[in-house]
Amino acid sequence: KRGLIKDIERNYHVRIKKQVSFIRDWIFLCFFLGNDFLPHLKSLDIYHNGIHLLLSVYCFFIKKTKQYDNDYLILPNQDINMSLLRKIFNRLHKNEENYIIENIKHHKYKRNYLDDIPIRYCYKGWSNRYYDYYYKTHSFLYIDKIVENYFRTLIWTKEYYFKGCPCWKHYYKYKGILLSDMKE
């Protein structure tokens, strides 16, 4: 734990004042890179810069605060600081297409990335093609259902890791989603 915090302080030029709060946030941030319950966000890949991207943006915002309890992603009552999460998503979203293209270049010979060829990420309208390809629709109502299920599963996963399993019947039903849909 101390080694992780020292590395992050050194590499991201940030001073972590509340180590327990930071560790909770670190665990929570890693959910976006995928785990047994949630797929990774399409633009974030744990094998190619995903951790660095998340930490860079997270530390950018943490540096701007006094690091009071309510300045962290996971609040003392274990709720999610939606204001900070929204800021993180908005900042990451600005370069989402570039992150995806870099991930594809990095994984250009791996089957799951080759499946994405019809989406043509470099061309306008790629996010609609993404949903058309994987879900056969790009209806906002359907995408809202996907985002809602993602957030419910995100909260479920947070509860599972921090408090214990809230319900064994819950699961995430879809493929990874785009930051552009999460930022709202």
Annotate the PLM regions.
Residues 1-184:
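Long, low-complexity, charge-dense
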